[in-house]
Amino acid sequence: MANSSLSNADIKHLKGIGHQLNPVVMIGGQGVTPTVIEEIGRALNDHELIKVKIPAGSKADRDAVANAIAEATDAILVTSIGRMVLLVRHNPEANPKLSNLARFG
């Protein structure tokens, strides 16, 4: 899902929070598997805003992987820089001690 539903101010704010985060999920050689999607979904439920490290490849390949992850997890792709992807999915029932939006926002 593209970041079209976020305003420029929202994107800037989320990038600022995301800058200090470490990747929660790193995708290995097997690529995007159902298990990886499940783990990303779990991380989004807990943290709302996460970084994912994707495999090396061409820019088009990395963009395709980033968009596939966002679509499969119903998340919004905030930004994709190099091998890092920043995703957000709001969870009204998120634990404030785990949510990166509540802790850093």
Please name every model-derived segment:
Residues A2-G105:
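Positively charged, polar, low-complexity stretches
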